[in-house]
Amino acid sequence: MSEYLQQIAKRRTFAIISHPDAGKTTITEKMLLFGNAIKTAGTVKAKKSGIHATSDWMEMEKQRGISITTSVMQFPYNGRIINLLDTPGHEDFSEDTYRTLTAVDSALMVVDAVKGVEDRTIKLMNVCRLRDTPIVTFMNKFDRDTRDPLELLDEVENILKIKCAPINWPIGMGKYFKGVYDLYNDEVTLFETGHGHEIYPYKKIKGLANAKDAIGIDLYEDLEMEIDLVRGASHEFDEQEFLEGNLTPVYFGTALSNFGVKEMMDGFTRYAPAPQHREADQRVVAADEQKLTGFVFKIQANMDEKHRNRIAFFRICSGKYEKGMKIFHERTGKQMQISKALTFMAGEREQVEEGYAGDIIGLHNHGSIQIGDSFTQGEKLKFKGIPNFAPEIFKRVKLNDPLKMKALQKGLVQLSEEGATQVFKPFISNDLVLGAVGVLQFDVVAQRLASEYNVKCSYEGVNVTLARWIFCNDEKKLNDFKKKYEVNLAYDGAGYLTYLAPTGVNLQLAQEKNPDIIFSATREH
């Protein structure tokens, strides 16, 4: 295999999906520890501690102590090059989180075993479903009193509609947690407390029967029964089913104590796919093609007054990036030279000399790049599957100075192109309605309008709870629909027709009465 093909085969690009506080920051940090990216754990402290996590970029993040941005961390592990895309887990996450999942080849789902499957996890899994993304699952916090592990598997299968194949099985929980049993290698790994900040060689015992003394007779007998039950009731791991997104291998452990993370990482790097082919409007692009192609899935604005630059996060789909090369910007039809692309290591920006399929690089953007833009070495290609997602929270924009209306409109359209918010102009009023997935997006927009466009605004409530993009092939039916429902209709910042529903019932009725109209929760960029 050539050096070029080896480089592609090494790449594993994934994101972690979880509900806030399920342990995502902790597990990220342990991965960096195993990848020698940090020397001791505890440097990516939870945000409450005052030591900021390595992925905090914006000032607002530091003030609020949450990770708004989707940063990228690259590190080596087991002969692989891991690209981990960090997704905000906080309540105030945004569409960026959803869109990041369009740039990965697989995902790690972290479940808080005390609480089970939670709301945010369900939403993120629905996004993974759009592309049948392969999922690995880590059941976290077994050093606490958790839910019954069989119950947890049932919940994942029933709520998330994915088959579970446990790879190992917990021995006890909480203060009686003794370790995990590997169902495929007949091996017990014994748990000890106090080793969370280091890579510790936990003791392993080959053969379940040989671990009887170490785990105690009561737990041993319970475990034997549970294993029989698990083997009978759960699914065998099947690599093809996993790659098709139908089945998830499940690992148990506690990220805080750095226990079970290595086993999960070993399994992940073994089974997770290398960079996959990507669909473009014109054709399918294979990862091992020689020419560079890729797309922008996120734009990171720097809130630092001194540096107004923005970074466009670019997923390489094929070919090799080399410093100083020229690329073709499909939307504008212009050539662009990349003199200083960035690579990301846990929040430190470094200039990158080369990149391969699966890698994420940062392009300096002075306003010409938008989310969803495709780049090639000359071919007209537009990658599919980088959607806008319907907002879930809406507010009306109130301008402090009415003379600044033009600047406000310009600012909002530009910020919507960047993915910071979505803007809607209703048919029957001069209002501007903003839509977002997370509350914090409204603060970000107000702050950026003030600093970049010199426009001060505030927000007030608006009678909208849901938005759906409207599509219809029959022009007459579409025109009839527009007349009948003009009170609910608006155009978004890019000029797409949108239905703004005051209630879920209102939307349901409109859908039932208009079977030929498509009400879509996503639209392509």
UniProtKB/Swiss-Prot annotation:
GO terms for biological process: regulation of translational termination. Its main location: cytoplasm. GO terms for cellular component: cytosol. One of its GO terms (molecular function) is translation release factor activity, codon specific. It is found in: Cytoplasm. PROSITE patterns: G_TR_1, G_TR_2. Residues 9-276 form the tr-type G domain. The keyword Protein biosynthesis applies. Increases the formation of ribosomal termination complexes and stimulates activities of RF-1 and RF-2. It binds guanine nucleotides and has strong preference for UGA stop codons. It may interact directly with the ribosome. The stimulation of RF-1 and RF-2 is significantly reduced by GTP and GDP, but not by GMP. NCBIfam families: prfC, PRK00741.1, small_GTP. This is Peptide chain release factor 3. It comes from Francisella tularensis subsp. tularensis (strain SCHU S4 / Schu 4). The gene is prfC.
